[in-house]
């Protein structure tokens, strides 16, 4: 693999990112509808309304996050300004979610496609699932736009077919049967059961965190690209989920519950609705498209699992080799790992029910950390209502997280295992970089390796419900966080050359202020403050006078190599980022006239 650099190119447009987001959010209805009925029966309509309200609130928060973090708005980027350990924890939690999402979506895709045979004792659907993950990785090797185009075609086909099902179902909605989630309004336990039922179906949120991780490769202005990516998808998902939830509850119980009293269609409810309201032939075609949509969701998960590794490695929290790009601007080694981890999970847990038990905790934890870290940060200005919304929605997500940790021991165990094994691997990396005696570094690396193996052992040999597992896992987390904190303080601060590019800001400027500067100055801050008040942009011009004519090699005199220019531009970018003012950088090298 020939690395050509470490800065990924910005080539993802809204019509690439939007379908990729739909590949995650849109897939939610393929299993959320069935799971909602499985857990809450005819009270599922109210639960889906509540999930949609939560989805709108979280999406509004992520519009703010994408605007404020154009270099990457995922949990790792936002939490890093508060705490390196917290950022790594958020990144690992998100990685756990992406791993399960990729494995679960890919396996469910072949359920929709009807692949369930066995060949020589080996399940054909599992073989197809592993092959599909490899094929998705091969396409991603050539950059995100390829799968973005495929995702766009699949998204358009899915929206059309879903619209047909919804239109055909509308005349039957008068038969909808709805039950209030709380059967005894004055019974506190009944309200608790309703809350737990709601948390069981909060599965549609990982796509929002995924789109935030893509801001680092979106074409500028990122705030516009992210908004155009999120809002149309959000509108379609919310409206169609409500209509389809009503259509599901309008079906007779004979089509929803089998003679033994167990819910049907838990993993393919959209196929059930297509058969009931349109017909079996249409359902067959729709199932093929729905399977393709699930594979699109796999692509989104793999892309963002790769992005998290890239950002952590770029900051020295993971091996530097993960930042090495191939000739197409893709971190190749990170891509390979992003394919191997969900494939290994599928080999260990080859059943949809088992995989579903690992879901939710990771993404809810990541979103909680992201919202609260952004809401409490002081590195940039936020409107009063923006800060309050981030904090309040983050608090709500925190309550959901606590509930999931209590009620889903398998998901809790899986998330703790990923967290501790990731922290142990991080400690090994930090020990190799820390300014400590060689023997001390080897000792820390040995401790990290032992903790890694110990966490793997207790995960496999202790039941997830056992208090011993919880005790040892939490103790490992605290132990690793403390040791890693010590090692981080022993690592010399490395001067990282900031990538200089124009800053989009929070608004479209109606005019521009032009400033010529040859050194950092508080005057620049004053101009930016005035520009913020009048919704203007600022252009900073640095003129480099050269004592020779600009020809030959001098014609390539670069802004990045001019230390004085870098100081001016970096100072201006810091001020602009804090105030949210659009800033353009102009570097003019010139010789004598």
Residue ranges and their predicted role:
Residues 1-32, 77, 88, 192-197:
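Membrane-interface "cap" regions at the ends of multi-pass membrane proteins
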Residues 3, 152-207, 213, 235, ...:
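Helix-loop-helix junctions that connect adjacent transmembrane segments
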Residues 33-91, 103-132, 234-242:
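Extracellular loop-to-transmembrane helix junctions
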Residues 74, 229-297, 321-347:
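TM-loop-TM module centered on a large, flexible mid-protein loop between adjacent transmembrane helices
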Residues 85-87, 122-130, 219-240, 310-347, ...:
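Loop-to-transmembrane helix boundary motifs in multi-pass membrane proteins
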Residues 131-172, 229-232, 300, 358-369, ...:
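Membrane-interface loop-to-helix entry segments
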Residues 150, 321-332, 367-413, 427-452:
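C-terminal membrane-solvent junction of multi-pass transporters and transport-like membrane proteins
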Residues 464, 503-564, 568, 575-586:
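Small/aliphatic-rich secondary-structure junction motif
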